[in-house]
Amino acid sequence: MRVNALDHVNIITADLDGTARFYAELFGLERRNAPPPLTPQNAQWMHDGAGRAIIHINHVDCPRLFDRAVEPGPTGALHHVALNCTGFAETLAQLKTRGLAHRLNEVTAIGLRQIFTLDPNSVLIELNFFGD
């Protein structure tokens, strides 16, 4: 077996609409209904610029085939989600306009600038800007 790429991250939340709005408004991800048997009331998928559903957002009441105890809020074993991005200055301005706490980091050896922020569920979001 060979892993080709990360497919998606799944976030379970009590605020489906607010979480989907966060990813759509701040990162420009396209919000779409998840495929059946999921419903618009229990799941939304966020698509990147290439049309990939990279973030799946499920309401706490959404049925799951393989389940484990999950509570909204602290993220258990998941520490962060990293996204490869463009538009560093625009993203930084949006965070400031929205009053969202964030931290910056640079890894000059590889030409990387990073912005870290939290989503509405306290999931740490790492935004990576290579050469931007």
Regions found by a protein language model. Give the residues of each.
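Short, charged/polar surface micro-motifs in flexible loops or helix N-caps
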Residues: 50-54, 60-64, 88-89
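A short, acidic/glycine-rich surface segment
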Residues: 40-42, 63-69
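Exposed loop/turn and edge beta-strand positions of beta-sandwich/beta-sheet ligand-binding modules
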Residues: 5, 40, 77, 111
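N-terminal beta-strand motif that seeds the catalytic metal site of vicinal oxygen chelate
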Residues: 1-20, 78-83, 131-132
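Core segments of cupin and vicinal oxygen chelate
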Residues: 12-54, 97, 105
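Vicinal oxygen chelate
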Residues: 1-2, 34, 92-132
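Conserved beta-strand in the GNAT
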Residues: 55-58, 126-128
